[in-house]
Amino acid sequence: MTIYSQGKSARPQSFHVSATTEDVAATLYTCPANCRAEVSMLLIVNNNGNTTVDVTWEDANNPSAPSDLSASILGSKNMIQGDYVLFTGATLVLEPGDSIDITPSGQATPHIDGLCTVTETFIPVG
């Protein structure tokens, strides 16, 4: 049970993505249209060479902001092979359409794995 799921239908889930193309964002997770999601764990692992990694939260729910509004979760972190960054102990709340993206750079053949655990709380329609 989380802050937002008390007394509501909710489900915990884990997601994974591999970012393997330089300077191209890979979407780790997108919050569904009928949910609010609480991210309780985020793990970023470098599996190949020396790579710079950006992890961003793409905010889809701010109509007055530019369409490319994003917030940096991990900004230009230089990671050598085997390095990882683990975020726990805090909660990031995503609204419908929000996403978490991972973008590797500075390495011709990057391999960055991203894993997250979220609790999706269903938003009643109507």
Model regions and ranges:
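C-terminal interaction-tip segments
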Residues: M1-R36, D59, P96, P104-G126
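Solvent-exposed, conformationally flexible loop/turn segments
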Residues: A19-V24, L74-Y84
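A short beta-strand element within beta-rich, extracytoplasmic domains
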Residues: A37-N46, S99-I102
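Short beta-strand/loop motifs in extracellular/secreted proteins, especially
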Residues: S40, T51-V55, P110-G114
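Beta-strand repeat scaffolds of extracellular/surface proteins
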Residues: N47, A90, S105-Q107
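Short, surface-exposed beta-strand/strand-loop-strand elements in extracellular ectodomains
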Residues: N48-G75
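Beta-sandwich interaction modules
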Residues: Q81-G97
